[in-house]
Structure formats: C-alpha cells, structure tokens
C-alpha cells in the first residue's frame, strides 16, 4: 500500500518533480470532471447546460 501511494503521489525532491506532480493532479482532475459532467448529462435533464459545446469533444 505504501508503494502504491508513493507511486501515485511521490514525494517531490525538486521543483520540477513538484510541478510534474501538480500537472498530473490537474490533468486527472480535468479528466474526472469531464467524465462526471458527461455522466450527469446522461442522467439529468440539465445535461445540455453541463455539456456545453466548448467542453464536449
């Protein structure tokens, strides 16, 4: 379990590693938001509002 957490969230040793970790978290958050909004658009009548043309691919 410790190995998994070190792989997913490595302790940054330099500013470059810290930036890479932040970038990975941001990308993961954006992907999760896109999946979540797509899920909501299939689920709720407000899907047209959530899946705006600038977000949907």
Curated annotation (Swiss-Prot):
Keyword Transmembrane helix listed: yes
Topology class, membrane: Single-pass membrane protein
Gene Ontology cellular-component terms listed: host cell membrane; membrane
Record localization: Host membrane
Keywords: Host membrane, Membrane, Transmembrane, Transmembrane helix
Residue stretches spanning the membrane: 21-37
Main location: host cell
Name recorded for this polypeptide: Uncharacterized protein U24A
